[in-house]
């Protein structure tokens, strides 16, 4: 009887320690709360932009008197456009206007290119922070022929197509490199490489 009474007293004395240990185990078993992760905002190509370009053109002019002439030289100008974006697809419209210093003479006939411009559609794929793109549209250029006696200047209209790579340099500054092929009817073909820098609004 005394033994049973002793067991009851010992059990009662150990009960608070058992409850404390159980509570500690319950607290330790709770999983840690993960720290919040900050997600960087996704860059968007959508919106308006404008910029300047510098390039070099390799041209081929066709004449009825001396055959083909290849006037090559530098060109420069400005561009502006507007982009829309849906997921990773970027599309929009862009125009450019500039001047080409291409000029060459052959057998007394001089061919000279002057003002040039285009209005094009663009479609690209967002590979943040760069975007490869394709472009195509209508183009026009001033072409002047001079044989020493007559000076003929005409504005030729044709088509243009090309591809490029645009890169985000900062949140508002863009850089690009572009190849374009342009055909002004059957009188002049041009191929040029352009580099540009732009500002995104």
UniProtKB/Swiss-Prot annotation:
Superkingdom as given in the UniProt entry: Bacteria
Disulfide bond listed as a keyword: no
Single GO BP term: symbiont-mediated perturbation of host transcription
Transcription found in the keyword field: no
Keywords: Cell outer membrane, Membrane, Signal, Transmembrane, Transmembrane beta strand
InterPro entries for this protein: OMP-like, OMP/PagP_b-brl, OMP_b-brl
Pfam families on file: OMP_b-brl
Residues in the signal sequence: 1-23
GO CC terms: cell outer membrane
Subcellular location, record wording: Cell outer membrane
Family stated for the protein in its record: Belongs to the Omp25/RopB family.
Domain free text: Has a C-terminal deletion compared to that of other Brucella species.
Name under which the protein is recorded: 25 kDa outer-membrane immunogenic protein
Organism: Brucella ovis (strain ATCC 25840 / 63/290 / NCTC 10512)
């Amino acid at each position: 009887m005394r033994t049973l009474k002793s067991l009851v007293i010992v059990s009662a004395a150990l009960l608070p320690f058992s409850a404390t240990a159980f509570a500690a185990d319950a607290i330790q078993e709770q999983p840690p709360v993960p720290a919040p992760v900050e997600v960087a905002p996704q860059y968007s190509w959508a919106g308006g932009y404008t910029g300047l370009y510098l390039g070099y053109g390799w041209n081929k002019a066709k004449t009825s008197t001396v055959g083909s002439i290849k006037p090559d030289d530098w060109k420069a100008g400005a561009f502006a456009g507007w982009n829309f974006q849906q997921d990773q697809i970027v599309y929009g419209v862009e125009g450019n206007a500039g001047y080409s210093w291409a000029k060459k003479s052959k057998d007394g006939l001089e061919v000279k290119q002057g003002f040039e411009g285009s209005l094009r559609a663009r479609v690209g794929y967002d590979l943040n922070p760069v975007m490869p793109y394709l472009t195509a549209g209508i183009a026009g250029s001033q072409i002047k022929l001079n044989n020493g006696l007559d000076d003929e200047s005409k504005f030729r209209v044709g088509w243009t197509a090309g591809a490029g790579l645009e890169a985000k340099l900062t949140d508002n500054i863009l850089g690009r490199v572009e190849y374009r092929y342009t055909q002004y009817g059957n009188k002049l073909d041009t191929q040029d490489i352009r580099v540009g820098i732009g500002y995104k609004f």
